[in-house]
Regions:
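A detector of single, family-specific signature residues
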Residues: 1-370
């Protein structure tokens, strides 16, 4: 085949069909074969990565969309046309695309685990917000007694006493035993809570409100309990895998990293030190570096719309944790706030500074020492 010849073919979504297609290409052309995809991960990527004769070139869907619109102002879209345009982009501008180079099995496993764990945390937050809204309808005292709802203590409390009427009937010894079993032994805190329970007045006694909402609270606590258990399972697996990586010590030594964020930072930088030419490359890829647009006398600075959102979330969440754990980070954050910056803007600016520092530590394999 030559550069001018094009063949269109639709591959059935079956493993054996993909195998047959891949082997037929290898038998026909031999050597290394470039494959342009609008994905950098997913089933088709995983399927093709097992063949050593395929080199995968991820094409950003936005890049392909803009390229398509340049020749089709009507914005008409068709998958076969998109496939041909992706091929055209790769042939005409090969220097603009970087082949997908898989990292080690350990780092890819860890990357998948930390992202799945964060999705479970999102589920937990969503369930907790629903539970808070439900309790406000008939049992608002729970929000006064417990600052955090996403705990086993709250799940067990609601499961045992789903309404205020039921908990007020409980004996003092029963309540004390319950709290002691959940490692709550501060006598002054316990006394205040018990007095509050006995003095509480119900928001409503209307069965049409209490019955359905108490049932919903029970269902939500069941879901919350499952989410908490699932997150703990992921924490245990991550805790076994992450410390085995030789670079883990670089990230666990960072202030505020901890067992949750240190593995995420390890995954964010990875182990391919040639992947990022500079700290600025990391800042841009992660979506932390701002974008400047200029046209005539207009000048507009905004954040990046297109970036790996989980990666940006990792750096922002970690930067927020360093405010109270690093002297200079706290001082810099307060300085930005005094200038009138919003909380999010100040934290992103702090993350921008941190990336430069961590990048240097990562490149030189030197643990951070404030």
């Amino acid at each position: 085949a030559d550069d001018q010849q094009r063949e269109l073919y639709c591959i059935p979504h079956q493993v054996d069909q993909i195998e047959e297609w891949a082997q037929s290409l290898h038998k026909r052309f031999g050597g290394v074969i470039a494959v342009a995809l609008e994905l950098s991960k997913g089933p088709i990527v995983y399927a093709l990565q097992k063949y050593d004769f395929f080199v995968i070139y991820p094409v950003n869907p936005s890049t392909l969309a803009k390229y398509r619109e340049a020749f089709t102002p009507s914005r008409a879209k068709d998958d076969p046309t998109d496939a041909e345009l992706a091929l055209d982009l790769l042939i005409r501008h090969p220097e603009r695309f970087t082949p997908l180079k898989p990292q080690s099995v350990e780092i890819r496993t860890l990357a998948c685990l930390v992202e799945q764990r964060r999705n479970l945390v999102n589920d937990k937050i969503r369930i907790t917000n629903r539970l808070r809204s439900t309790l406000k309808q008939y049992y608002p005292q729970m929000l006064e007694w417990f600052e955090q709802l996403d705990t086993v203590l709250v799940c067990d409390f609601i499961a045992r006493w789903p309404t205020l009427t039921q908990v007020k009937r409980a004996r003092k010894n029963t309540l004390e035993k319950f709290f002691h079993e959940h490692n709550m032994r501060f006598s002054h805190v316990l006394d205040v809570r018990l007095k509050s329970i006995k003095a509480a007045m119900p928001l409503t006694l209307d069965a049409a409100v209490v019955t359905p909402y108490s049932l919903q609270a029970l269902v939500l606590t069941d879901q919350l309990r499952v989410s908490l258990q699932a997150i703990q399972r992921y924490d245990d697996e991550i805790a076994k895998l992450a410390p085995k990586h030789p670079d883990y010590g670089l990230f666990s030594a960072l202030p505020g990293a901890g067992p949750s964020l240190a593995p995420r930072l390890l995954v964010a930088f990875g182990e391919q030190r040639e992947r990022f030419a500079s700290a600025a490359a990391v800042q841009k890829y992660a979506g932390i570096a701002p974008v400047t647009e200029r046209s005539g006398k207009k000048h507009w600075v905004h954040w990046r719309w297109q970036c790996p959102t989980f990666l940006r979330q990792t750096f922002v969440e970690w930067a927020a944790q360093t405010i109270n754990k690093s002297f200079w980070a706290g001082a810099y954050y307060r300085q930005q706030r005094e200038k009138g910056w919003t909380y999010q803007s100040a934290v992103r600016a702090l993350a921008f500074k941190w990336i430069r520092i961590v990048y240097r530590c990562w490149q030189t394999r030197t643990p951070y020492n404030e």
